[in-house]
Amino acid sequence: RLSHSDVLIVHNDKMEIWLKEQGYTKPMVCLEIFDYLSPSVNNNTHEPNQKPIKVIYAGALNYRKNKYLYSLNDVMSKWQFELYGKRFEEDKIKDKTLFKFKGFVPSDQLIEQVSAHFGLIWEGDSIHTCSGDLGIYQKINNPHKASLYIRCNLPIIIWKEAALASFVAE
């Protein structure tokens, strides 16, 4: 079906390469990162040495999609995770004090109220690498949550092999 288009707007150069490897031959334009339009402003700040380190994750929270979330308390016991989204399966968490489940919050409200050190972009089965189908997709995908975190004035934690990793590093 893509071959019916004149031009594709793709997320990034890695997605462009992947599509070419799949046989797509028409022109492509790389978006690089999504805009995030919002009248909301986040003026909250955190000192680098302030404890605990607070990390937000916004998105689908169910075990099937983000199995790694349910293993974080094995390695991140001194951090606190604020989870925004739906379908968090709290019964699968060992140490419930590590997580603050905020539920679904409209994006403008989240931008104004979030108070954290980092935003996390990660998906898949493992806390060590983005694995599984959803994790591997990070190699060519630009998650919209990256733009949300930037709009919240948050530095981003991202897998080193993710398509947006070089953008985040810059």
Model segments located where?
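Conserved catalytic-core segment of nucleotide-activated headgroup transferases in glycan assembly
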Residues: 36-112
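Nucleotide-sugar-dependent
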Residues: 110-151, 157-166
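Short, well-ordered alpha-helix to beta-strand connector turns
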Residues: 4-6, 96, 116-117
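A short, active-site helix/loop in glycosyltransferases that binds the activated sugar's phosphate group
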Residues: 4-28, 88, 162, 166-167
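Nucleotide-sugar donor phosphate/pyrophosphate-binding loop at the beta->alpha transition
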Residues: 1, 37, 138
